[in-house]
Structures are given as C-alpha cells and as structure tokens.
Amino acid sequence: NIDDVALIFEGGGMRASYTAGVVATLLERGMDFSHVYGISAGASHTVNYVSRNIERSRASFTDLVCDPEFGGVGSLLAGRGFFNAHHLYEGIAEDLAGTDEIMAFDFDAFLANKAEVHIEGFDWDTGETVAWTKTDMPTMRDMMLRVRASSTMPLFMPPTVIDGRTFMDGGMGTSWGICLDAARRDGFERFFIVRTQPRGYRKKPLGALPRAVFR
C-alpha cells in the first residue's frame, strides 16, 4: 500500500473520459493508495478505483455515453435532466448488481478495500461543503447517491436530495474540484493528483448570466 501519498481525482465532467485510463492503469500496476479523494466526476473515479474494477473504470466515461438512457433533450424534457442522473448512478448499479456486466459495481470489493474514501458535495441551501466517507456509505445505494450528489451539474441534472438536504456538484464548494485542502487536513504532504485540466489552468470568473442564476 501507498500510505504516505494521497490520491486525488479532479472533477471535470466528461473530461474524466480522458483520465479514466489513468484509473485503470493505476489498478493494473497494483498501485494501492490508502487514502483516495474525489469531487464530481472524480467521485466516480474514486469509488471505481477503490472497488478495483478495471473495466468499469474505463467504461464509466466512455462506453456509457452509448447507453440509450444516458440522457439528452428528451430526458431533459421528461424532468430527468439532460444527463439521466438517477439511471447513471443508482439505476445501473442496482440493475446490474450480481451480474458479470462491465458496468456492474462490486460493492463487496469496495467495502473490503481498506482504503479511506473522501468525496464532497455542495449544500445548495446553506452553501456548505459536505464531506462523505465510507461510514456514510453502508449500502451501495447510499454510496451511489452521494457520488451522484457530488456530480450533480447545475442546469444539466436535477438536484440530489439526501436526508432532506439538497445537494449540487461538489466542484461548487470550497475545494473547487480538487480535494487538496481535505488531504492536507488529514496530514498529507505528498499528493498524486489526476487532473482533468491542463497545467496552469485558472478558472475564469462567472459571467453576468451565471451570476444571476446562482446568486
């Protein structure tokens, strides 16, 4: 195990299709980090990595876009969001549980892996950044619901409600898509960060329309 370096997956929506190969390569090379952090799309990478499912790690952001239930305008008009979030997270995991399909999630392997997990969501009502760990994920549904909450892109997905609280994409929180501060608070000084943005990228300030929508 790699105990002195935190593995951090940056969020980034479908840009995570490029970093899915990194997840698979880490698993293929037996690089087992003891602490794994992720936000938004990085939360999906986090749980796939901890479950040690190489094929699912690759397929989650590549093959899945071919799923007829993936989303689109029809899904948006039906109230499911442009990305059919419930189907993509809890739906697929529960429908394929116990099968040998590529997108089946091995929750037993996830629990058996001793690696610590840290993902974050953004409380839409309070503006609070909320962190979840394995203790908040006793079932696969609990886990997938939190991954979905961390990945809920405003305007593209309906808000995710957990215990009466409304959550949106964790990238809107204090970590800005990279759980570096959380890893530092956990005592880490060395980090293996899987980026979805090029080196030197700086997010531009929101324009007038987004500011009006999210104020």
How would you label these PLM feature ranges?
Residues 1-39, 47-215:
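Patatin-like phospholipase
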